[in-house]
């Protein structure tokens, strides 16, 4: 089957978009924490934003490895949070999102990748 038609392709695209958006959210959370005087939390959010950027890069590299080149567009439908509150709210939202990824989304994506024959994508 053409990779571009697989669920793994869709999941990698969702993951790339999600990690990219998470990076931006964490960058904004850092600004908010700094504004509230929480320098340690601001640095923690900035470090987490950097981690999300690295994750996004890994997903993009897998898309480029398997997809037809150049990949001009991948259509998919997904929901992403658009929250920005005070630092305590941002911490709770971050924990909620990271838990959702770790407990549900990424294990399901990995299972699908293995089933479709993309073991290295499953290992992300």
Predicted regions, residues:
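Non-heme di-metal
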Residues: 1-124
């Amino acid at each position: 089957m053409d990779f571009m038609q697989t669920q793994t392709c869709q999941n990698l695209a969702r993951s790339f978009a999600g990690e990219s958006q998470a990076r931006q959210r964490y960058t904004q959370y850092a600004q908010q924490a700094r504004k509230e005087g929480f320098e340690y939390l601001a640095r923690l959010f900035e470090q987490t934003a950097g981690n999300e950027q690295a994750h996004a890069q890994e997903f993009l590299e897998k898309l480029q490895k398997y997809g037809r080149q150049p990949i001009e567009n991948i259509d998919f439908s997904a929901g992403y949070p658009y929250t920005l509150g005070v630092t305590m709210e941002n911490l709770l939202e971050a924990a909620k999102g990271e838990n959702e990824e770790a407990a549900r989304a990424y294990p399901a994506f990995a299972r699908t990748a293995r089933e479709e024959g993309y073991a290295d994508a499953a290992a992300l």
